Amino acid sequence: MAGMKIKKGDTVQIVTGKDRGLKGKVIRAIPDQNKVVVEGANRVTRHTRVQQSSRGSQSGGIVTQEAPIHVSNVMIVDPSDGRPTRVGYRFNDDGTKVRISRRTGAEL
């Protein structure tokens, strides 16, 4: 299985699902599951048990947070024009491997 081409900190656009068209930043990448967590997308409600912390405060209740999305449902956004693009790789003159936009050829 090939590695994921989307990394933490990338700006992506969701191409399928209930949040289709939404752009956001990747908060977390989960390579072993081929999933990413996108800021502000795929919000779910979790009911957490109230737990006593060491300082005496309580945490719990109903919490809204982002859930992971499969990488096939997101595309990286080209920084030159803000449109979604596929990702390719190229080697620079000094031998370093860089990600490029398949549409424009710009470095990501």
Swiss-Prot record:
GO biological process: translation
A molecular-function term among this protein's GO annotations: structural constituent of ribosome
Gene3D superfamilies: 2.30.30.30
SMART domains per record: KOW
Biased composition annotated in UniProt, kind: Low complexity: 51-61
One Pfam family named in its UniProt record: KOW
NCBIfam families, per database record: rplX_bact (TIGR01079)
Known role: One of two assembly initiator proteins, it binds directly to the 5'-end of the 23S rRNA, where it nucleates assembly of the 50S subunit.
Family from the record: Belongs to the universal ribosomal protein uL24 family.
Assembly and oligomerization: Part of the 50S ribosomal subunit.
Name of this protein: Large ribosomal subunit protein uL24
Species for this entry: Parafrankia sp. (strain EAN1pec)
